A protein has these predicted regions:
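Residues that define the transmembrane beta-barrel architecture of outer-membrane proteins
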Residues: 38-40, 59-65, 110-116, 129, ...
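Predominantly the C-terminal beta-signal and adjacent terminal strand-loop region
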Residues: 92, 182, 195-234
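Residues on the lipid-exposed face of transmembrane beta-strands in outer-membrane beta-barrel proteins
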Residues: 44-48, 65-71, 118-122, 135-139, ...
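Short glycine/proline- and aromatic-enriched beta-strand/turn motifs that initiate or cap beta-hairpins
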Residues: 23, 27-73, 79, 226, ...
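Cleavable N-terminal export/targeting peptides
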Residues: 1-37
Length: 234
């Protein structure tokens, strides 16, 4: 589990470097015009996610944040690089087989989704209100953690719950003598959605609300969810 946590922290640190670099490069550019026609765009928001099947069979909801930065070709066309993190809360159904195997109810777990994406955004912007569509793709890494290590026996039937936690099945049975406390899977995926903006301050701060569908073919269980993001754009 320590290795998984170290890997997750490393991924977050790399994401920080990726999105901090554009700010460092522009830090000394005092002549940059940061009005409505600025070439730089940034965003930071809180995301509450609704999982879709098959992910919804294993998680109730997700919450986290989204941060991004990019380049505006014009007032309508832009590219945006984003990092999304969501903490995934497991359902009771996905915990039950693990609790039965350990003969205790004192077992919990959680998952994390990390996504690095490059996106195209088309926006129609008025003086106060705006709307946009956004779509792109990138790399999605998802993991799952148990609060206790689990060693499988020889009579456990394979159900989606075992697959969610990373166990391997064979001929309808969970393969015996596996010991796991965490697992992870990475895959390239796509996303698409739309949002609305409201100008809230000068020079060009905008409050935004966005819904976006994300899909990635992670091993054992595909990642499909819709984060509803509320935040500030600049």
């Amino acid at each position: 589990m320590n290795k998984a946590r170290l890997k997750a922290r490393t991924l977050v640190f790399l994401a920080f470097l990726v999105f901090a670099l554009p700010y460092a490069l522009h830090a000394q550019d005092h002549d940059q015009d940061l009005d409505e026609n600025s070439k730089i765009n940034t965003n930071l928001g809180f995301a509450l996610s609704a999982p879709l099947n098959p992910l919804a069979q294993n998680t109730n909801f997700g919450w986290g944040f989204e941060v991004g930065a990019g380049y505006n070709f014009s007032s309508r066309h832009a590219i945006v690089g984003e990092f999304l993190w969501n903490r995934l809360q497991p359902t009771q159904e996905v915990l039950t087989p693990i609790r039965v195997a350990l003969n205790t109810a004192n077992v919990n777990g959680h998952g994390n989704l990390y996504a690095w994406t490059a996106n195209y955004r088309y926006e129609l912007r008025g003086r106060s209100l705006g709307a946009y569509v956004i779509a792109g793709g990138g790399f999605y890494y998802r993991n799952a953690h148990l609060s206790k290590s689990v060693t499988t026996g020889v009579s456990a039937s394979c159900t989606p719950a075992w697959l969610w936690w990373g166990f391997v099945c064979s001929s309808g049975q969970v393969s015996s003598d596996q010991t796991l406390a965490s697992s992870g899977s990475g895959a390239f995926g796509v996303n698409g959605g739309m949002g609305f903006t409201v100008k809230v301050d000068e020079p060009r701060y905008r409050f935004y609300v966005e819904a976006r569908y994300h899909y990635a073919p992670n091993s054992r269980v595909n990642t499909q969810l819709i984060p509803i993001t509320i935040g500030i754009r600049f």
